[in-house]
């Protein structure tokens, strides 16, 4: 993703050991007009757009993953017929035209040590996806073994954050045994060399305690992290920075 743009459709990441190649498969948004579910479409390969992934070519990876963030213009009436709420959509700059996700669902298959162990990650793009794709809330989320609710550390828990939590996530723990976590990303914005490490740790602990109280979960299940600094640490092979990012806790 890039500034101002993130994944626009639910995206699954996993490793299918019988597949000879890595790939991204994309289900066009127009399939929402059909009565078939995403699970049913998974059994019909011809409806999916297949993009090969070359893990040795960074430019290829960037171009391929950029597809997951794509949008397309559509008349607002057509968007409503597809189940979108117009107030949740971005204007295309023309009267009665809005931007909708180009894809309904994305599947990413590639080899990774964690994915080889059977881990399957489902990334959802936020409230609009949860509210307009019933299969997410009725099937996919309830079948998860753990849900990690990603929040920014440089803002509080917003009203829209609480709406997602209360309407779609909190009750999952009541229906099935499931682990609920909150990851507070961007803790590096709190890093302040002038104030000292004690001040920084106090600020991070306050965020953990406040978040746990607001969401009604254990403080131990609130994980402060910096994904950006963890990535930089991996690239630079900086073990101290990686430890400070706290990604290992996650």
Tell me what each language-model feature is.
Residues 1-250:
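Globular "head" domains of long coiled-coil molecular machines
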């Amino acid at each position: 993703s890039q500034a101002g743009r993130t994944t626009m459709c639910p995206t699954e990441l996993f490793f299918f050991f019988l597949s000879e190649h890595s790939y991204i498969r994309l289900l066009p948004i127009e399939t929402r007009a059909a009565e078939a579910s995403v699970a049913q479409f998974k059994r019909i390969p011809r409806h999916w757009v297949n993009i090969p992934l070359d893990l040795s070519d960074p430019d290829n990876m960037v171009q391929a993953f950029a597809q997951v963030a794509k949008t397309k213009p559509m008349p607002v009436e057509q968007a409503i017929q597809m189940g979108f709420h117009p107030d949740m959509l971005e204007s295309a700059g023309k009267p009665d035209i809005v931007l909708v996700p180009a894809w309904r669902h994305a599947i990413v298959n590639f080899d990774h040590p964690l994915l080889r162990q059977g881990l399957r990650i489902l990334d959802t793009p936020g409230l609009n996806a949860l509210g307009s794709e019933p299969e997410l809330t009725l099937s996919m989320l309830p079948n998860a073994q753990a849900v990690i609710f990603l929040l920014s550390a440089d803002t509080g828990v917003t009203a829209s954050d609480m709406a997602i939590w209360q309407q779609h996530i909190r009750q999952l723990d009541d229906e099935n045994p499931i682990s609920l976590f909150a990851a507070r990303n961007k803790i590096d914005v709190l890093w302040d060399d002038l104030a000292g490490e004690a001040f920084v740790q106090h600020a991070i602990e306050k965020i953990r305690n406040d978040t746990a109280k607001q969401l009604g979960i254990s403080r131990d299940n609130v994980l402060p992290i910096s994904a950006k600094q963890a990535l930089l640490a991996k690239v630079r092979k900086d073990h101290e920075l990686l430890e400070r990012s706290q990604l290992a806790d996650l």
